[in-house]
């Protein structure tokens, strides 16, 4: 199974409610560039943070790559969520290609946890970065990092 991690594109500056920040034009361009790397992937499930910028990223990416399935908005993919709790939630997703659209520091910590069982040294993920993890199942130290790509915008 492959777990694909996509950080949202560049967003408007911090506001009173972080969850309401939206993608900027640069952020949309970043997502479109990331989509070029993912056009050949057929995602079985797409999960997104409920934050606006992540939902916009998931919508734009899925439209760009022709993904016709639903985007599942889950409350446990926010920047503050705990890696072990997210790992437990993901345990039930036995699919070939799973895409998570979320935030730092969660995605970097999740990648480190799944590949090294270490949360202290999170994987660096700029806006619209894409990481691919692969393993037989989701668990601490049970996956391998197959790729990490950063946009150049």
Predicted features along the sequence, with ranges:
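Alpha-helical structural signal in soluble globular domains
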Residues: 60-65, 89, 113, 117
């Amino acid at each position: 199974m492959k777990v694909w991690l996509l950080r949202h594109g560049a967003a408007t500056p911090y506001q009173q409610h972080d969850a309401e920040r939206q993608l900027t034009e640069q952020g949309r361009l970043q997502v479109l560039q990331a989509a070029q790397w993912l056009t050949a992937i057929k995602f079985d499930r797409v999960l997104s943070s409920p934050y606006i910028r992540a939902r916009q990223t998931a919508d734009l990416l899925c439209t760009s790559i022709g993904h016709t399935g639903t985007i599942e908005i889950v409350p446990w993919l926010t920047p503050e969520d705990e890696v072990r709790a997210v790992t437990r939630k993901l345990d039930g997703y036995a699919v070939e290609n799973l895409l998570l659209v979320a935030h730092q520091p969660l995605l970097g910590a999740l990648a480190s946890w799944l590949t090294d069982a270490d949360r202290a040294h999170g994987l660096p993920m700029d806006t619209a970065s894409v990481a691919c993890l692969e393993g037989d199942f989701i668990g601490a130290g049970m996956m391998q990092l197959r790729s990490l790509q950063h946009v150049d915008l």
